[in-house]
């Protein structure tokens, strides 16, 4: 334990005062100490197991060789008295044997428990010492330098850009203007009692009718009334041309207004327009019976369709953006036949353009593929030509080398080589013939003299073969040296043939 403490103190002095390094050092030291403690515990357990095995063998031996004398028991008991106390054994009493076994097992368990408790106490004590040392080291450390550059940096603000909410001023102005125009106009309303018709009658004089054409009109949508500018409706193309054939006979006194569920804010110009029908009065001023006329286009928008301007009729005003009040669905229930035809034509044009674009992309891909194939084929042909050219050049070089060797070779030397090869071939043939004859004669040789003679001949033949091989190797090396020397001489002559009399060469730089 003292040695471990000394090593820990030395290592702590060697480290710098960096907090992160000290933490890593403490963690590593704790791991090492834990590993050493575990090894010590394992060694102790092994020693205990060995002692227990020895005790068991001794007890079995005493059971097998039990004597009335107690000399053996006296010898065994002092040796193992520190761990197990073996009781006296009677050879013919099975009950005493079982009692002794039980007592032995109990003593074994108690000894194991004591050892485990001692080991746990040692481990706890060692860990507490290490914790105290670590706390002392942390207390003795200098405070952390705040000016040191940190690895992790955080921003003061998470959001770099904050966008303020939009205020829809135009909608609020229109709302207040509609509220002012609605004041005092509800007394002039006359709603028809016919079921299934959503019509509103306005009983106005001629002057008021002309004024309303310049100003506003009351429109009903799903049981809600709104004041809208007549010029805006006419400019958007929602009002059909009014038939003024009977205007000289009967002046229009009442206007029957019918509107669809579409918004008049200008976002959807393909919605159905409000239908205005002139209803005549009698000359006496008494109103006639008002029969509501059905619209020309019977495919009206149902009441369940999405209405984007329902919030206008309510007293509460929601400050929301314009995109939130626009319904994403474009309904075709309230479109006129002409508008439907135009829509179909637009869809056909879009489909046609889309098909043309797809066809153009397919053609471009085919063209690119064709160009790539052409380029690849050209590159492959070029590579083949290069390979063939390289082979042709290599073959020409080999032929030139062979010709140069044949030209530069001495005829006398070639004759000598040929003669030598012939001589070697003849020698080989003679040797093979002699060997064959010797093999035939071995059958007739008898006694030690014949065997010794054959062995000597075999040794002589082996020596001759070895000498011939050495001579052949020497001749081959000499020939290679001569060829190398000749090639160097040729290179030197070629280099010297290039005359460079007017060139200055500085040999010192």
Curated annotation (Swiss-Prot):
GO terms for molecular function: microtubule binding. The keyword Coiled coil applies. Keywords: Cell projection, Cilium, Coiled coil, Cytoplasm, Cytoskeleton, Flagellum, Microtubule. It is found in: Cytoplasm, Cytoskeleton; Cell projection, Cilium, Flagellum. Microtubule-binding protein that localizes to the microtubular manchette of elongating spermatids. One of its GO terms (cellular component) is microtubule. Belongs to the CCDC181 family. Residues 320-334 have a biased composition (Polar residues). Residues 60-82, 338-367 have a biased composition (Basic and acidic residues). This is Coiled-coil domain-containing protein 181.
């Amino acid at each position: 334990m003292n040695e471990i403490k000394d090593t820990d103190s030395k290592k702590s002095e060697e480290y710098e005062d960096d907090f992160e390094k000290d933490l890593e050092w403490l963690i590593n030291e704790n791991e090492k100490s834990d590993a050493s403690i575990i090894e010590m515990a394992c060694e102790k357990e092994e020693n205990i197991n060995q002692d227990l095995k020895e005790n068991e063998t001794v007890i079995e031996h005493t059971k097998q060789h039990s004597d009335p004398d107690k000399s053996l028991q006296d010898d065994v008991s002092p040796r193992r008295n520190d761990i197990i106390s073996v009781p006296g054994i009677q050879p013919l009493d099975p009950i005493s044997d079982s009692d002794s076994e039980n007592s032995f097992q109990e003593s074994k368990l108690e000894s194991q428990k004591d050892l485990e408790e001692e080991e746990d106490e040692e481990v706890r004590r060692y860990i507490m010492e290490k914790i105290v040392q670590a706390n002392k080291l942390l207390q003795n450390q200098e405070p952390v330098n705040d000016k040191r550059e940190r690895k992790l940096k955080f921003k003061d603000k998470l959001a770099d850009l904050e966008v303020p909410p939009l205020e829809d001023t135009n909608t609020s102005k229109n709302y207040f203007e509609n509220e002012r125009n609605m004041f005092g106009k509800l007394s002039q309303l006359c709603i028809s009692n016919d079921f299934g018709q959503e019509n509103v009658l306005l009983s106005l004089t001629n002057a008021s009718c002309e004024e309303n054409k310049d100003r506003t009109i009351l429109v009903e949508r799903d049981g809600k009334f709104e004041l809208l500018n007549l010029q805006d409706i006419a400019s958007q193309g929602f009002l059909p041309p009014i038939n003024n054939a009977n205007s000289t006979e009967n002046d229009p006194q009442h206007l029957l207004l019918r509107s669809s569920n579409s918004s008049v804010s200008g976002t959807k110009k393909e919605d159905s327009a409000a239908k205005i029908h002139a209803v005549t009065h009698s000359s006496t001023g008494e109103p006639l019976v008002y029969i509501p006329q059905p619209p020309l286009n019977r495919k009206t928008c149902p009441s369940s369709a999405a209405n984007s301007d329902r919030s206008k009729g309510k007293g509460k005003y929601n400050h929301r953006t314009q995109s939130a009040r626009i319904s994403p669905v474009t309904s075709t229930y309230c479109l006129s036949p002409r508008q439907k035809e135009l829509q179909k034509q637009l869809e056909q044009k879009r489909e046609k353009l889309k098909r043309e674009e797809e066809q153009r992309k397919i053609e471009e891909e085919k063209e690119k593929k064709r160009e790539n194939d052409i380029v690849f084929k050209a590159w492959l042909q070029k590579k083949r030509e290069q390979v063939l050219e390289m082979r042709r050049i290599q073959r020409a070089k080999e032929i030139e080398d062979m010709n140069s060797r044949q030209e530069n070779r001495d005829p006398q030397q070639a004759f000598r080589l040929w003669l030598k090869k012939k001589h070697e071939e003849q020698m080989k043939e003679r040797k093979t013939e002699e060997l064959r004859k010797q093999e035939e004669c071995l059958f007739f040789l008898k006694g030690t003299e014949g065997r010794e003679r054959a062995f000597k001949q075999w040794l002589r033949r082996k020596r001759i073969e070895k000498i011939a091989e050495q001579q052949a190797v020497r001749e081959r090396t000499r020939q290679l040296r001569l060829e190398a020397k000749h090639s160097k001489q040729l290179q030197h002559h070629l280099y010297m043939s290039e005359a460079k009399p007017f060139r200055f060469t500085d040999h010192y730089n």
